[in-house]
Amino acid sequence: MKLVVVGVSGRMGQALVRIICETQGAVLHAAVGRPGSASIGRDAGDLAGVGPLGVPVTDDALAAFVNADGVIDFTRPETSVEFSALAAQARIVHIIGTTGCSPADEARFEAAARHARIVKSGNMSLGVNLLSVLVAQAAKALEASGWDIEVLEMHHKHKVDAPSGTALLLGEAAAKGRGIDLTEKAVKVRDGHTGPREPGSIGFATLRGGSVIGEHSVLLAGEGEIVTLSHSAGDRSIFARGAVKAALWAQDKKPGLYSMLDVLGLSSPH
């Protein structure tokens, strides 16, 4: 499968190049960097530390998508929206690991999915997606009247969005288990005299510092006991492996908007 990596200059982009090189059935077709980036013109393999691959980094996404089978995208919401439109035009696979997307962005992805095979997730790792299933089960089993749900996450100091896409994914899983709408029940800020905790709400706490790749915990707090479900990411390659796995999975699927739960066979039967 001929894959394009966009945002190749970043840490995730370079991790993707390395994983593609070691994955049977995948090959790096093109690599896209930001216009004006110092990486433009450099060999993507050299950039990722795997040696020359004969794939120079370009800032022309349209040309890069020609004759490709799929694109893997951990960039920014505004660029992911642009890439989804290009993927739809090219009728190819688009794997989106970008977080911090707005409802308007999500609507654009849904529109693009009429022609592209899009897999979008706040986290591409197997462990986190399994965790989300367990969170939904726990939230369903432990009733809101006696159990409060809090989502705690920590990331490196350079992360620009909060709560993380993974924290929101886990919050959505908890809300699904409870049969509620997360947008109505989420509490993302607590400051000053907040009063008692709102019954049935799902709280979020965000920590930033150092080089932490990703730590997530979902706490279900009852009277006299706490159940904690957690995941720790020790290496960015777990996200890259999941993204490449998703691309290979989506290659023979119909156009549509899929999640990593679909890729991993963890989605609920429809």
UniProtKB/Swiss-Prot annotation:
Q: Which residues bind (S)-2,3,4,5-tetrahydrodipicolinate?
A: 156, 165-166
Any single GO molecular-function term of the entry would be:
4-hydroxy-tetrahydrodipicolinate reductase
- Grouped into one coarse class, the protein's main location is cytoplasm
Indicate which residues the UniProt annotation says bind NADP(+).
Answer: 34
* Known EC number: 1.17.1.8
User: Which reaction does this enzyme catalyse, per its entry?
Assistant: (S)-2,3,4,5-tetrahydrodipicolinate + NAD(+) + H2O = (2S,4S)-4-hydroxy-2,3,4,5-tetrahydrodipicolinate + NADH + H(+); (S)-2,3,4,5-tetrahydrodipicolinate + NADP(+) + H2O = (2S,4S)-4-hydroxy-2,3,4,5-tetrahydrodipicolinate + NADPH + H(+)
Q: Where is the active site?
A: 155 (proton donor/acceptor), 159 (proton donor)
Q: Which UniProt keywords apply?
A: Amino-acid biosynthesis, Cytoplasm, Diaminopimelate biosynthesis, Lysine biosynthesis, NAD, NADP, Oxidoreductase
Record InterPro entries = DapB_C, DapB_N, DapB_N_CS, DHDPR_bac, NAD(P)-bd_dom_sf
Q: Which GO terms describe its biological process?
A: diaminopimelate biosynthetic process; lysine biosynthetic process via diaminopimelate
What highest taxon heads this organism's lineage?
Bacteria
Pathway field? Amino-acid biosynthesis; L-lysine biosynthesis via DAP pathway; (S)-tetrahydrodipicolinate from L-aspartate: step 4/4
- The protein depicted here goes by the name 4-hydroxy-tetrahydrodipicolinate reductase
The first-level EC class reads: oxidoreductase
Provide the family line: Belongs to the DapB family.
Q: Which organism is it from?
A: Allorhizobium ampelinum (strain ATCC BAA-846 / DSM 112012 / S4) (Agrobacterium vitis (strain S4))
Q: Name one Pfam family in it.
A: DapB_C
Which compartment or compartments is the protein found in?
Cytoplasm
**CDD domains per the record?**
DHDPR_N
